Amino acid sequence: MAKFNTGSNPTEEAATSSRPFKVAGQSSPSGIQSRKNLFDNQGNASPPAGPSSMPKFGTTKPPLAAKPTYEEKPEKEPKPPFLKPTGGSPRFGTQPNSVSRDPEVKVGFLKPVSPKPTSLTKEDSKPVVLRPPGNKLHNLNQESDLKTPGPKPGPAPPVPENELKPGFSKVAGAKSKFMPAAQDTDSKPRFPRHTFGQKPSLSTEDSQEENTSKNVPVQKGSPVQLGAKSKGAPFKPPKEDPEDKDHGAPSSPFPGVVLKPAASRGSPGLSKNFEEKKEDRKTDLAKNIFLNKLNQEEPARFPKAPSKLTAGTPWGQSQEKEGDKNSATPKQKALPPLSVLGPPPPKPNRPPNVDLTRFRKADSANSATKSQTPYSTTSLPPPPPTHPASQPPLPASHPAHPPVPSLPPRNIKPPLDLKHPINDENQDGVMHSDGTGNLEEEQESEGETYEDIDSSKERDKKREKEEKKRLELERKEQKEREKKEQELKKKFKLTGPIQVIHHAKACCDVKGGKNELSFKQGEDIEIIRITDNPEGKWLGRTARGSYGYIKTTAVEIDYDSLKRKKNSLNAVPPRLVEDDQDVYDDVAEQDAPNSHGQSGSGGMFPPPPTDDEIYDGIEEEDDDDGSVPQVDEKTNAWSWGILKMLKGKDDRKKSIREKPKVSESDNNEGSSLPSQHKQLDVGEEVYDDVDASDFPPPPAEMSQGMSVGRAKTEEKDPKKLKKQEKEEKDLRKKFKYDGEIRVLYSTKVASSLTSKKWGARDLQIKPGESLEVIQSTDDTKVLCRNEEGKYGYVLRSYLVDNDGEIYDDIADGCIYDND
């Protein structure tokens, strides 16, 4: 210890002589006197000279960036109560106080280290000072601890010490760094490296001491202790737990060994380097403390830096003050420029493999007990923080995050599962200062999202229920409407879809009756049907949905628009009306392409006075045309002609009538006849299982032309037609006759027939009566039909013999066995 004091005098005086202020009465003692003082200090167990060294460097000139107020304070610097008579003791304890007083000192010019090796050589002969390299600092701390039982002079005058900020010199900074190094090894070449490693630490202390100089006492501790303490992760600020303060007691072992787990938590690569290179450990620690200070979120951690220069101060005293520093306000000044700090220390070797995932997971698991954010708040990638070149501008970003340290600890364990995928995707992206808050907010937002999902499910269920209810109501309403429409269709004999033909306006109030529509003057009425109505009335519908007949004189009608509407919907019926009498001409014309525009008078709507009479005459046709497309108009015409032919009285004409039916089925296979419902009443099974190709043309086809004239005169005999239909039904039921009724040939009853008693299935015949043979039942009887349309069996013996030609024509007729 005394070596540094004796050896550093020339340099110290040289450094202080260039300053405008110098301590009065301070002269460099001789080497013998220094040794004597050293022995006195060790033998008497004098208290640490940390505070007593304040008058040594109290008058040094502040650096270029020092405040001008420092020049006014040198007169307060000497502290006689704490000075030891010897010269070595003040020098030995100068470093901690000078560092704590001078936060503005710039150590960038700390280069006069040449006298230090000579001092080391002198100390080789002192066995009292020399200790094993592994325990030098530890023993030194123990010696300092033995000196501390007395009153601690450091915190006694806190105000004067805070005012003596410019009292730190370059040589003092150098001595504070070299003393622990000299005790570890006697090699000289290591001094420049320690000097460079110390510069950033001193600059950090300069920027940090300003925040704590007002309320925090002088810090005491070895630089190695601070390095070991701060060697923790450069990306993760070290834990500030009361346990750490307890470890800093005077009886604690070497600080580097105690705080080694902190380094392994922050950076596995640095911990490996610490184990492999014990020679360079102090350089690494000096560099890592500066990185740790830059990356810390709480500026209260920075006041620990002055303890690095207090070689003779116990570690426990510096830790006792740590609790007071944590509550300090953030620092207000950035670090000095790089030109003042000097060149950075050499960069240590990088570990071969660096994997921070397990540390991130461990940090996320322990984040509940930490008040700091998990990783670096400066958002630096992993490699750059190890390089000191990027260190000076970084402290400027610290004041931008002052509120973060004041936040209470947050319990962010629930979102651990959410953080792992983020770490997996962003391995090189460190967690930012607001990462914890964002994750918590994300968790809250996700919780809200889940609540929204639950509520949305409930809303969906409600919507589904409402939708079901609405659909059920719609179905009920639809069923009611359909039921009502069916009743209306049945009541008013409506066929096909209901179409609005015309819109009319009521010209007077009408009070309807049973089937009549009631409406008021000016009300709009939709005309649904203008045919198949009672004379002078149309079928209308009001806006309320009521149906009924209206008088044509009670509404205002635009006949021009009605004609155009009628022509667009149905242009064929008027031509049929004109050619009603010429049935076959009409059919032939319909057989043509059926179009030609239907222009001219044939497509014009008839005048109102004759509308009722004309449409009543052809109401069956209009019904069909209103509900059937124009494609079926040809079939309509054919059915109309067939119906007229069915009204003949003559049985021979009836047989001729069957041929057009067959030809119609041949020409229009697959097409449905709209008016067939009127014909099916005659015999629904007429067209069942019938193929026109199975039967040869009837021999009576030649007489078709002869029946045309009579068909016209007999077409208006509905009673005869109904009777014929009834007889055909009896035939099918009584004789189990299937298929089309076809006449095989005609014959007459023998004139020699005598009246006899007929059976239930026998046809009552008269002598000379003409009969139509429908079926050859067997060799004794045949199925015949008389002129009245009745059917029955007739014995062949009662019929006139036609020379056996009859049997040739019927071929396989015997297959019909109706017995």
Curated annotation (Swiss-Prot):
T-cell receptor ligation leads to increased tyrosine phosphorylation. A motif (SH2-binding) lies at residues 584-587, 615-618. Its main location: cytoplasm. GO terms for biological process: integrin-mediated signaling pathway; protein localization to plasma membrane. The modification Phosphotyrosine is found at residues 559, 687. GO terms for cellular component: anchoring junction; cytosol; nucleus; plasma membrane; protein-containing complex. Keywords: Acetylation, Cell junction, Coiled coil, Cytoplasm, Nucleus, Phosphoprotein, Repeat, SH3 domain. Residues 448-495 form a coiled coil. Residues 1-490, 589-635, 649-728 are annotated as: Disordered. Residues 1-45, 668-677 have a biased composition (Polar residues). It is found in: Cytoplasm; Nucleus; Cell junction. Acts as an adapter protein of the FYN and LCP2 signaling cascades in T-cells. May play a role in linking T-cell signaling to remodeling of the actin cytoskeleton. Modulates the expression of IL2. Involved in platelet activation. Prevents the degradation of SKAP1 and SKAP2. May be involved in high affinity immunoglobulin epsilon receptor signaling in mast cells. This is FYN-binding protein 1. The gene is Fyb1.
